[in-house]
Amino acid sequence: MNRSYSKESLSEIAGGDEDFMGVVAQTFLEEIPPDLAALQEAIDNDNKELAYQFAHKMKPNLEMFGIDVQKDVAAIENWTKSSKPNSAIEENITRLVSVLEVVFKELEEDFK
C-alpha cells in the first residue's frame, strides 16, 4: 500500500525495531500537529520569525519520515526572509497541511 510517508525510512532509523518505530510515530503525532497549527497561525498573522522557527523545527521530522514536502517547507522558510505577502506561499502551506493530514491518518492506522 502506498503511503505518504516512508515506512522504510522510519524502519532504517529505528534499526527495524517495530516498538521503537511506534514510539517515534507516536512522538511525531504528538508534536507535529500543534507545530503545524502554530505554523499556519504564524503565516496567517504574517509573523515571519515565528513561521520560520516552526518550519525549521518540523523539517528534520518530515525528512526522517520521508515525507515529500521539502520544497514547500523551503518555500515557507524563504518567504520568511522576504517582503512578499503571505498569499505568496498559500499553495505551499495548503499542500503541506493536506499531505500531513494524510500522514497523520496513515501513522494512526499503522501504529495503533
Ranges and model annotations:
Residues 1-5, 9-13:
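Extended low-complexity intrinsically disordered regions
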Residues 2-4, 24, 28-30, 61-75, ...:
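Amphipathic, coiled-coil-like alpha-helical segments
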Residues 10-22, 52-55:
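Short, charged, low-complexity loops and linkers
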Residues 14, 18, 32, 43, ...:
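Flexible interhelical turns and helix-capping residues at alpha-helix boundaries
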Residues 16, 39, 43-51, 80-87:
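Short helix-adjacent coil turns
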Residues 58:
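An anion-binding catalytic pocket shared by soluble metabolic enzymes
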